[in-house]
């Protein structure tokens, strides 16, 4: 079975391939079928944005899996404007950041927060299957199982 992954991110492709290993699935990416259009993600949660993307890419393919993620720092209140949340690449209403700009921005923010923060992701996943949407989202329990430390310096291994 062919499934479109609504992403151009190689890490997300690998993640889903690993998660669904053993199933008879051939993953197709947006690049494979030359889709360059992107939906406007106006959701208020990772799940809502995943649904928006799944419906949008469902125009091009019968079965689609989409994922959206929010990054959160325990040291910041959820309402704090510095909280990345859904705006990991566009913090504080900034223009979209490149990878290098994003590393620089978050390194400086984390330095201001003491040099180290406890971070966690909340994932939203949506599946479009011939016009029917199914979705789910991580909950606050992810804070206990999926936490990691971020420091104010980029890893030297990031290019490996």
Each language-model region and where it sits:
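Anionic-ligand binding patches
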Residues: 2-4, 11-160
């Amino acid at each position: 079975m062919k499934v479109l992954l609504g992403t151009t991110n190689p890490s997300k492709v690998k993640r889903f391939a690993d998660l669904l290993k053993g199933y008879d699935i051939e993953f197709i990416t947006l690049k494979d079928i030359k889709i360059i259009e992107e939906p406007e993600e106006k959701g208020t949660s990772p799940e809502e944005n995943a649904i928006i993307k799944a419906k949008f890419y469902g125009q091009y393919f019968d079965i689609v899996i989409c994922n959206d993620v929010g990054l959160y720092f325990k040291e910041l209140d959820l309402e704090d404007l510095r909280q990345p949340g859904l705006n990991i690449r566009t913090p504080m209403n900034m223009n979209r950041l490149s990878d290098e700009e994003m590393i620089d921005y978050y390194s400086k923010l984390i330095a201001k927060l003491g040099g180290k923060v406890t971070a966690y992701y909340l994932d939203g996943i949506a599946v479009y299957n011939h016009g029917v949407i199914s979705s789910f989202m991580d909950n606050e329990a992810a804070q206990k199982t999926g936490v990691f430390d971020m420091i104010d310096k980029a890893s030297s291994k990031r290019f490996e």
